[in-house]
Amino acid sequence: MSGTIQVDQVSKSFGKKLVLENIHLNIKKGNIHGLIGPSGSGKTTLVKMIVGMDQSDHGNIQVLNQTVPKLSLLQKIGYMAQSDALYGELTGLENLKFFASLYKLNKKEQKERIVYTAELVQLDNELRKKVATYSGGMKRRLSLAIALIQNPEVIILDEPTVGIDPELRVSIWDELMRLKGEGKTIIVTTHVMSEAERCDMVSMIRNGGIIEQGSPNGLKEKYHVDNFDDVFLKAGRKQV
């Protein structure tokens, strides 16, 4: 069965440094797929290529049966980067209005999506403040709202819960599970193993390669462990 997102034999270098090598992914519609690994493992580079912000040196990437990069696909992809791309001199509401205006939403849809996303990330009472006054956690929450503003078919979130308090993290994950139920396809990069365990499938990335893939429960059974951290440790030792 072909997936909503297909990555086939993808490699990427920056100068002489090989960042990703021979990456394969097949992510099905309505799945949450976790990319886990240490900083510098290549997770962010991979999601940027899936979005179409970077191009691979070798291999092919398809999203919704279209080869990336493709400008029209951005209407269907919600992307939250690791570093917040926000306008500090504007208010939270003005940021949401600006990004909503980039998509094919009528005025009524824009208003509804702004209300929904602001409430989801618990910023509805902070929207009149300038983003320059926001804390780091508030900026992450606004970035997440922007990633969801156009009701995208594909949602790609790079470390979405960094700097967010535990209660809101639970709320965000509950919403991701609801979106999954609507048939949205979601990629999440994370260092947090408890979050990885909520994914349908995970790919463990280390030194530019995928060292293990599978469902969280399947991987725990394979390595005969109860703790998902131990899966990553054992898979890493196997690579060496």
What are the language-model segments listed below?
Residues 213-214:
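ABC ATPase "signature
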Residues 155-159:
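Catalytic Walker B motif of ABC-type/P-loop ATPase nucleotide-binding domains
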Residues 51:
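Helix-to-loop junction immediately C-terminal to a conserved catalytic motif
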